[in-house]
């Protein structure tokens, strides 16, 4: 087992995002049981707030773009909306249980 030199943010959809997704997309329905997405961040951080502030726009846009390319349907990309649309948990330990390498695009 290998230790990956990254921390992580686990980003889970809250009701406003779920409602937005379900209004955009007929192919699948999102609900509160939908698994969170994990974003790798710097390994050593002491205060979560600056990490979220420096990454929330990229994360918010990634979550929106995964559902729709219609930018006119997007909410304002700001911290207030991010906190209303997603819950975030952070951690500093990432372990790779696989033998093969990790591919990144």
Identify the residue ranges that each predicted region occupies.
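Extended, charge-biased low-complexity segments
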Residues: 1-44
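Amphipathic protein-protein interaction modules
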Residues: 42-104
